[in-house]
Amino acid sequence: MKITNFTKSFLLYEIIVGMFLTLKYFFKSKVTIRYPNEVSKLSPRFKGEHALRRYPDGEERCIACKLCEAICPAQAITIEAKEQPNGSRRTTKYDIDMTKCIYCGLCQEACPVDAIVEGPNLEFATETHQELLYNKEKLLRNGDMWEHVIAKNLKVDSIYR
């Protein structure tokens, strides 16, 4: 047994095996995509930039139940609510600190009316920290911009909910 181990270490057996493995994959077709020019298809469950949705009549979906704020493990969501004259509650402030967010999707799962969702946008880099502090208006704009894709993804995913 010692002679076998000595022979393997003398002939650098592990390095040779590793080089053959490298050569094997070197000549296979590449699986990498060239990202900015080529974009892969996103899953309907992709968790990207947050958005607040509206009903088709334009009314905000959020009922200020604060379940998303309570369930957020990173404590990235801050909500302030006010009761309306008709008895319903609406948010006066809905902020998400995207620098704290871990994109777990628990806020989306907790929402009883599908108001807060993580949309399909994965390219939302910014130049300043302040731009990553999303307020209600920014979230509603995101929802309006991506509503057609978000609605389709939620419909596809509805069989699993």
Swiss-Prot record:
InterPro entries: 4Fe4S_Fe-S-bd (IPR017896), 4Fe4S_Fe_S_CS (IPR017900), NADH_quinone_OxRdtase_chainI (IPR010226). It catalyses: a quinone + NADH + 5 H(+)(in) = a quinol + NAD(+) + 4 H(+)(out). [4Fe-4S] cluster 2 binds at residues 72, 101, 104, 107. [4Fe-4S] cluster 1 binds at residues 62, 65, 68, 111. It holds the Pfam family Fer4_7. It is an enzyme of class 7 (translocase). Its EC number is 7.1.1.-. It is a peripheral membrane protein. NDH-1 is composed of 14 different subunits. Subunits NuoA, H, J, K, L, M, N constitute the membrane sector of the complex. This is NADH-quinone oxidoreductase subunit I. The lineage of its organism: Bacteria, Pseudomonadati, Pseudomonadota, Alphaproteobacteria, Rickettsiales. The gene is nuoI.
